[in-house]
Amino acid sequence: MFGTIIRHVVGSRNDRLIKKARAIVAQVNALEDRFKAMDDATLAAQTAIFRERLARGEPLDALLPEAFAVVREVSRRVMGMRQYDVQIIGGFMLHEGKIAEMRTGEGKTLVATLPAYLNALQGKGVHVVTVNDYLASRDAEWVGKIHRFLGLSVGTIISDLSSEERRAAYAADITYGTNNEFGFDYLRDNMAFSPADRVQRGLHYAIIDEVDSILIDEARTPLIISGPTEENTDLYYRVDKLVGSFVVDEDYTVDEKARQVMLTEEGIEKAERLMAESGLLVDGDLYDLANVTLVHHLNQALRAHVIYRRETDYIVRDGEVCIVDEFTGRMMSGRRWSDGLHQAVEAKEGVAVQNENQTLASITFQNYFRMYEKLSGMTGTADTEAFELNQIYGLEVVIIPTHRPVCRTDFADLIYRTSQEKWKAIVEDIRGCQQRGQPVLVGTTSIEHNEFLSHLLKQARISHEVLNAKQHQREAEIIAQAGTPGAVTIATNMAGRGTDIVLGGNVGHQVDMVLANPDLEEEEKTRRIESLKSGWQGLHDAAIAAGGLHIIGTERHESRRIDNQLRGRSGRQGDPGTTRFYLSLDDPLMRIFGSDRLSGLMQKLGMKEGEAIEHPWVTKSIENAQRKVESRNFDIRKQLLEYDDVANEQRRIIYQQRNAFMDADDVSAEIRALRDDVLDAVLAATAPEGVMEERWDLPGLEAALDRIFGLQVPVGQWLEQDKGLTHAALRERIMEMVLSAYAAKESLMGSEMTRHFEKSILLQVLDSQWKDHLASMDHLREGIHLRGYAQKNPKQEYKRESLIMFNAMLDQLREEVVSTLSRLHVSPAPAEPLDWDAIARAAQPRHLQFSHPDFAAAAAPLVEDAGLALTGLGVIGEQEAGHSPAISDDKVGRNQPCPCGSGKKYKHCHGRLQ
């Protein structure tokens, strides 16, 4: 109560921030006439003046009023659009590193031009992040006109660009692109083998459009670059055949909240019997340690059949299983579920099962975007997630006032007993809207419901448009015309987000289509455009007279924010509009959160078929259920971040060290340090200083020196011959032999080849060890929760063991680099002139896959297939002099002996470097 009184007297934190911003707006407005009086050339020259002032040491904030006023004037001249005062406030909040919550239709795209221009003056680059390629290309072309007028360069990062095109786009002053592309380019840069192959520069300032979608909805799914592993896919088909006979509640139980399936005792016995009969379970019980793989496959097959539904969670297209994003309804081409789940779904659908992939590099959006020096974002719905955005990213949410008052009416939810009654009521509501000429947007939660409603409307002979993952290409066109009188549009959740629904239709989009039609003469184009423009006002007025855009929600989402996004499509810029959610007791949210009590109440009230409950109390109870889910999801994301922070710190160390190696022309000093560390480790393990010689493991020491350095070192003989040989003298004598042998090889290879070779081996072994470490970390994380049963803190155990694994990886890295370099011998065949860049590119991993929501169709490999990285160097393994084997990784099996002559399996020798 006391806090309420204080807020009433001094205003809320949001009110105080808006008041501060209004003072900036007053300064910008005072400069308007000054810049209006300038001609185009003088106005464009302001950029050079601003940069000169920055170079003299003037702070960036001092330029803000003038820079914003310049952008506003250029926008008026180039775009015919002048930023409103509330848009100036939004731009100021973005510059301050905050999240601006702005209602749909308030012009967020135009707002971003203000801080983007101001911060680009520093010359460090500004990234404007959108959710898909279409919006990135559209914004770069549309508002990019403002920046280009002012002499700034604008780049676009979308899928299917070459490295050269990406490098040029990142070199621009302002770069528009998708969150996935920015993240994948960061990972690719940290897998490059030459500084020239990197495309990004520093992560200076990012403005994220639809920031809630990117930083919250997609935060739990990491960006992953992976490569194929060798695994028998037949097991997925064999296990899939067995689970079809399992019965729910008898053989297994389902936890819908956790999306998990658990076998009962009867189910375990049945699984053991069926697996034994099919030859899968050869020995022991199902849950014996030796059969853990079978348990894993069985669980994933059950989840594929019971939890994951076709047309809701995925669709099958062209013989492939494509995941459907639960938040947007879009296909997530190129993304695959991990841990064998995607393979289980493929087996269920009878399509080709593709091998699982091994992670080569990964990062979450949480950790990627926290690397930017300054971060800001904008969205129409962030206030419900303000606590999480502040806790995890340190971003404050500021609610920006609307330019015009919101005239939308949000009706209370209607709740029916069955889904059949609900769908019938929805169809009747749509029919009524179309008859009175009111445009309707219907939001569904899945493609299945989307197409089911379309089927009902066809039966009722109601014309409509369908927008889901299958109509992704027509998305902008369908949304653009969703505001015409009587239009009915069915869309999965947030499909079409980023494109405004204009009452009367988007005449600009229609004009663009006419201009792009090559079959029309110029005179016909002009006539049609004039007709469109003259007819639009009548359509606009008719749509308003009918009540504006009517939003129908077919069920509540787990998150209130997603529901608010749907509501927010109506009532843009002061237009009228209405919204209504239709629910049934069969809906997932209602079913999970206590629909039994509500069902009993409806029966006691004697409600007939087709009657609905409509009361604010019921709506409030549903919102309370949503808050519970949101709280649980926040806890999950926070916990995931705590685990990922451990890997993130290790990633930072590895990438920092890797970049230092790659930027250096000469890593010989680092190689010498590694050699010293390895020798010290060998001596500490076999002949530790301070321990009597009688207790030294001399055979082990000699074997280790032979294995690592390829040298026959007679340590025992030395000690026999020189009783006074100290530990330090012994180490010095061994090192002399090692350095002498290496110097002899270097004299044959030449200094230049040796330096290049050291760098190449160091980077390749580092990548190989990091890849294996990521897999080990995944395995550790999967089972770490079981430590809780032993009264141990899983997070602390994860941190402790991951550090042990990380240090062990570094030890293995040192030994493998030194061993590889020490055991190489120069071929007597003269080496031809070498193309080191081509050699470096050939060493990169091949057949990569990039996975995350909304990532465009399976990306092509980064490099063409090439021979083994070491081929052509004139370098071979230690072997008989004069014999140089032909090395071809395409013909050597991973478990066959390596042709270099080392005696190791190919996958543990040169194949490991791929």
Swiss-Prot record:
InterPro entries: Helicase_ATP-bd, Helicase_C-like, P-loop_NTPase, SEC_C_motif, SecA, SecA_CS, SecA_DEAD, SecA_motor_DEAD. SUPFAM superfamilies: Helical scaffold and wing domains of SecA, P-loop containing nucleoside triphosphate hydrolases, Pre-protein crosslinking domain of SecA. May bind 1 zinc ion per subunit. The keyword Protein transport applies. Zn(2+) binds at C898, C900, C909, H910. ATP binds at Q87, G105, E106, G107, K108, T109, D500. Gene3D superfamilies: 3.10.450.50, Helical scaffold and wing domains of SecA (1.10.3060.10), P-loop containing nucleotide triphosphate hydrolases (3.40.50.300), SecA, preprotein cross-linking domain (3.90.1440.10). Its cofactor is Zn(2+). It is a peripheral membrane protein. Its EC number is 7.4.2.8. The keyword Cell cycle does not apply. One of its GO terms (biological process) is protein targeting. Keywords: ATP-binding, Cell inner membrane, Cell membrane, Cytoplasm, Membrane, Metal-binding, Nucleotide-binding, Protein transport, Translocase, Translocation, Transport, Zinc. It catalyses: ATP + H2O + cellular proteinSide 1 = ADP + phosphate + cellular proteinSide 2. Monomer and homodimer. Part of the essential Sec protein translocation apparatus which comprises SecA, SecYEG and auxiliary proteins SecDF-YajC and YidC. Part of the Sec protein translocase complex. Interacts with the SecYEG preprotein conducting channel. Has a central role in coupling the hydrolysis of ATP to the transfer of proteins into and across the cell membrane, serving as an ATP-driven molecular motor driving the stepwise translocation of polypeptide chains across the membrane. This is Protein translocase subunit SecA.
